[in-house]
Design a protein with these regions (language model features):
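Bacterial N-terminal signal peptides that target proteins for export
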Residues: 1-7
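C-terminal motif of bacterial Sec signal peptides marking the signal peptidase cleavage site
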Residues: 13-16
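Polybasic (Lys/Arg-rich)
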Residues: 289
């Protein structure tokens, strides 16, 4: 309902909008506008005042809203649509990945290693290397190991996530700080991947990831603002104006708190529908969270297994490429 109301109010262009004799701040004309209204699917122009659309229609009809200070934008026939909504994302995690090492399109183990080596040179010795979003299918399916990156990051801790968020790779420096070794027991709902000698390979799945994630130094308030702004800007550049965020109360990300701070400072430029993990949802009912057209709580997230790419989704039978593994 939150999305629908705001979509209608701010983005969907309705031909039934009442006429407003006030001058518009902006008029967009000579456009190919998709309205989302079954009664008038397309239009040429629309008028905007503040954060609301005054009217939509023909170029000629919008002239009634033109004032001495109205900004006129010629769309040159381009297609215009209401902003897109991302219905499931991890907002702060996404912003963090934009500002850290990029591994999503690494095409080989060598490129994977080189990107981490290059990024390592751009940060100080105390900074953890995070981000990643790697995908082993880009180079044939072999899972990465800590020895891929230990040589280029002997002293800097590295924790890079797989693209689905259900598995990470840590180097030896990070594992040592976390106290994870061959004697570390597996975590319920998670797994430490080990070699033939029982030594961790650097891969940790689902709940076992918390052994590393929980010890990564907390972000400063300034850094959190930078991360959320980076994510927001990337979304807007791709036409996304509203998101459903799955980690509103996550202690490491603090998405709601950060969004609220930016909203108060008038620096929030996307709408966020916040969700809470199943274990945190009681906090939403007890705390005095503000809910308005910019930030609102409204969902709870829980899951029972994992993902296909990380081989953690639960099946009755073994994975075809991982004998003995039925998931978690």
């Amino acid at each position: 309902l939150f999305y629908l109301n705001n979509f209608r109010m701010l983005l969907t262009l309705f031909s039934s909008c009442s006429k407003n004799t006030n001058s518009a701040d902006t008029i967009v004309f000579n456009a190919n506008v998709w309205t989302g209204d079954e009664n008038q699917k397309t239009a040429q122009a629309f008028a905007i005042k503040g954060d609301e659309i005054l009217d939509i229609g023909t170029d000629e009809a919008m002239q009634q809203y033109k004032g001495s200070n109205t900004k006129m934008i010629d769309a040159e026939g381009k297609f215009i649509t209401p902003g897109f909504i991302d219905a499931h994302m991890h907002l702060m995690r996404s912003g963090e990945m934009l500002l850290n090492v990029q591994l999503r399109d690494a095409k080989s183990p060598e490129e994977f290693t080189q990107r981490i080596a290059d990024f390592s040179k751009t940060i100080d010795a105390e900074t953890w290397i995070t981000g990643g979003s790697w995908d082993q299918t880009q180079w044939g399916g072999e899972m990465p190991r800590k020895d891929w990156i230990d040589g280029v990051t002997p002293n800097k801790p590295v924790v890079v996530m797989r693209m689905d968020g259900h598995m990470l790779l840590a180097n030896s420096a990070a594992l040592k700080i976390a106290g994870v070794d061959k004697n570390t027991a597996d975590i319920a709902g998670g797994e430490i991947i080990r070699d033939a000698n029982g030594e961790p390979t650097g891969l940790l799945k689902d709940n076992a990831m918390n052994l590393l994630l929980d010890i990564i130094p907390a972000w400063s308030e300034k850094r959190k603002h930078e991360i959320l702004k980076a994510a927001s800007q990337h979304l807007l550049e791709n036409g996304v104006t509203s998101v459903t965020d799955m980690e509103g109360l996550h202690p490491s990300f603090q998405s709601y708190e950060t969004a609220d701070q930016l909203r108060t400072a008038n620096e929030l430029n996307i709408r966020i529908y916040e969700g809470a993990a199943l274990g945190d949802f009681a906090k939403v009912n007890k705390a005095d969270y503000k809910n308005d057209k910019w930030v609102k709580f409204g969902l709870v997230k829980g899951f029972v297994d994992g993902s296909l790419g990380s081989r953690t989704a639960a099946f009755k039978y073994d994975y075809s490429d991982a004998p003995g593994n039925k998931g978690m």
